[in-house]
Amino acid sequence: MKQVARIADVLAGQLPEGQRVTIQGWVRTRRDSKAGLSFLQIHDGSSFAPLQVVAQNALDNYESDIQHLTAGCAVTATGTLAESQGKGQSVEMQAESVDVVGWVDDPDSYPEPLLNATGL
């Protein structure tokens, strides 16, 4: 059984860059690039901030699963920690695998992100 790292520990720098880790959590957002990459923001409840997981189109399930992930889908991701090339985070995971544990049955009815909320 793989040992699962907490995202809070990864973001706090408790695990060194270059280390291979496994995380479990829920997709907050997915962005796709023209370069054949998907950027997944994953959270596990251990931190308010998500971890960015970079999935390349060379992954076996890239077209069948990764490109269909929506907010709320549960995943297990394994990969290597690396210094982030983007803004907003210092570390990211270069994914070797992203396995879907659970799908959101009706993504259109899934609660809107808080960013879209206009008030309480």
Q: What residue ranges belong to the model's regions?
A:
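Class II aminoacyl-tRNA synthetase catalytic cores and aaRS-like
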Residues: 1-120
